[in-house]
Amino acid sequence: MYARVKDSVGGNAFSAFQIWGPGKTAKVQCDISANLSPAMFRRFVQPYLAAQCEWLDFSLYHLDGTNALQQVEPLLEVPRLNGIEWTPQAGRPGGGDPCWFDLYRRIRRGGKSVQAVGVQPGEVIPLIDAVGPEGLYILVSGAVDVRTSEMLMRGIEAYR
């Protein structure tokens, strides 16, 4: 399958999460993890997740909802997992809310990148200030007009 989807430089994209990598790139997940203890996750999921990440060149784990947060430590233990994408469930603040900043810092301290989704334009700079720009991939939500885009580009210039 990879031979069919790779581009001219050997990369591929996973468009649902807007990621691309110069090699085998995919989003990995286990949504039932919300119903597993960390011990069960380590026993039944982690070995298979690790095998997937070994095969891939770049991997991003889809961490889905607050009930799955108990799996952050087991995820940080997967050596070849590159990043963790955090999706708060409906009814919770979006990915740019300060209530998630500690989670993002914890993931970064664990050596993984973070994809923050559902971030509003006005939350971008406070998020970068709180977490730092390294290893942070921000997906801005909603319609962003040209003026807002230009303002964001000027705002993030200091972090380049």
Task: Give, region by region, the residue ranges found by the protein language model.
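Active-site loop segments of alpha/beta catalytic cores
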Residues: 1-160
